[in-house]
Amino acid sequence: MNLEERVQIAILNKYYGALLTNRQQSILSMYVDNNLSLAEVSDELGISRQAVKDAIDNSLLTLKQTEERLHFVGKDAKLKEIIKNKAPNQIDEATKLELIAYLED
């Protein structure tokens, strides 16, 4: 797993990690945040590598499907882009309406 994938998973986990079980959160954190291999996670938890892989795969599926439905990560990035391109005192009524409309989508 490359750095870009790890960052994307960390972002998804920040938004939707509460939807995972404590066990899934723990395994995903060990694998992604602590950069442990499947074997290292399995040794640490005393479970098979296949069980670790299944937990990671199921966790990632949950996180990705939730983003596909809710689009919170995408909307947040778009809002930050809109705001970044405006000086704080330049957010006029049209921009406010654009932001509100975007949030309501």
Per-segment meaning from a language model:
Residues 48-49:
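Helix-turn-helix DNA-binding motif, specifically the short coil turn and the N-cap/start of the second
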Residues 69-81:
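Short, basic, alpha-helical segments at the C-terminal edge of helix-turn-helix-like DNA-binding modules
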Residues 22-34:
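Short amphipathic alpha helix immediately N-terminal
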Residues 80-105:
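Helix-turn-helix/homeodomain-like alpha-helical modules used for DNA recognition
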Residues 55-58:
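Residues within the DNA-recognition helix of helix-turn-helix
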Residues 40-45:
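Short alpha-helical "recognition helix" segments of helix-turn-helix
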